[in-house]
């Protein structure tokens, strides 16, 4: 079992994600917020045009189901899983996150695009790691109402789980945890 959580001292806001495997693989996350952003279960069909801001649309795209807030027709996913069984969750990481400005000659992915960008084109954690190593997680807000959220991420399939953090010292750090 792999569990990722973060709690601010004295704060009520905390999220926990977990992935464990017996004969099946289970992936999930809670959302410990005192208020709602209007989140709902959202299904993004195959080949949905996300309109990524700085990257081209992938040539193939998997269907995604998860919890999201819909703004201007765009699913702002909190956590989700694709049709291949790859799951991804964003968890609070306030005070630790650093998103870069757009970097020339890198694949620039906005923080709000990160979950669908990975899930629409990857089947496994290994494929996700390959894409993450080539990308820049950038600081472009979704809108004036939705600035970049201070999140770190858990990505999991039936064999492997990683944590992804965008921090100033090393840009993007990936922590691997082999499931038992």
Describe the residue ranges of each PLM region:
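Short, Lys/Arg-enriched N-terminal segments with co-localized hydrophobic residues
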Residues: 1-13
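Short linear motifs in intrinsically disordered
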Residues: 3, 68-70, 140-146
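Weak global preference for isoleucine
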Residues: 13, 41, 64-65, 70, ...
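A contiguous strand-loop segment
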Residues: 13-107, 139
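Alpha/propeptide regions of enzymes that mature by internal proteolysis
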Residues: 90, 104-138
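Accessory structured domains or lobes within enzymes
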Residues: 122-180
